[in-house]
């Protein structure tokens, strides 16, 4: 780390260091900076508040500051104020040009409703049960003039999504097709609504201006990680006293049944999706 610091200092001659990670390695880099008179700003991750929010007993269920705000404060403390001028990954454009996703499908036609579904996440505590999600897919697929795009990665996920695509009309799996991240993100910018877990797909869809119906289990929006400009009405979750049990969803369910997810009805998800769909053709 000392060698890394020396190389960075020699190459860039920086006069400020912003630590947006606040772990042992970045703490050491910050120490080296301070020893050389370089101004340091460290993000406040709010660890104490997160512990109070996720502990099993005497839980303090209050919304914490968003991670975006914590980033802004870290820049501000070092003299680099961040203005709130972000309009999405595609700038002032509502979406990416149609040719950007041409490798995946034809351009969207008038009256067609496009729905994206990203049903997986890194940890079990953040994944809506597959059997229940299939009911969501089947119900949405029965809506006229609707196409559903399934997003996922990995062999096991691809098998599940390919199975759904075979069983339901107008459902297409993109898992394992290797269209590339830019093309898939461009497609997401054109869909009417994305169904996602508390995962990267939730954030990516939000960043391209697509409404997201997010499903929350072991984690909670109060931890500060909800999607950019996401409506609370589109966050599907149950008011359980044990929620949230962790910030990132990695802890096993102490109940053993993940009722926080299995207790969510497929229809409650469908209802939130439908209100984002445009009118059907001829209506």
Listing of model-derived features with the role each one plays in the protein:
Residues 1-283:
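Catalytic machinery of carbohydrate-active enzymes
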